[in-house]
């Protein structure tokens, strides 16, 4: 256990950030999963709607620093490509 006041504060801050990031990552995965499920079901309209809902969530996670900007860009690109296969 930490003895310094600053170390104790850091532990509290890290726990708070961990919980916040965990929630954002979980939400992010859910939105991505919805897009993939709609594509698997070959439901083009639902897939497009899910993609339009997922893109802001992915971008926001990147801007908050939860995921890297390149990771966000890659996710958006791959999901868009996947949805476009439905025509």
Swiss-Prot record:
InterPro entries: Ribosomal_bS20, Ribosomal_bS20_sf. The keyword RNA-binding applies. It holds the Pfam family Ribosomal_S20p. Keywords: Ribonucleoprotein, Ribosomal protein, RNA-binding, rRNA-binding. Gene3D superfamilies: Ribosomal protein S20. One of its GO terms (cellular component) is small ribosomal subunit. It comes from the Bacteria. Belongs to the bacterial ribosomal protein bS20 family. This is Small ribosomal subunit protein bS20. The gene is rpsT.
């Amino acid at each position: 256990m930490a003895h310094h006041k600053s170390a104790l504060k850091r532990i509290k801050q890290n726990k708070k950030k961990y919980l916040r990031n965990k929630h954002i990552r979980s939400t992010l995965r859910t939105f991505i999963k919805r897009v993939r499920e709609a594509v698997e079901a070959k439901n083009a309209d639902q897939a497009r709607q899910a993609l339009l809902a997922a893109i802001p969530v992915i971008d926001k996670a990147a801007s908050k620093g939860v995921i890297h900007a390149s990771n966000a860009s890659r996710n958006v690109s791959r999901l868009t490509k996947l949805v476009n296969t439905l025509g």
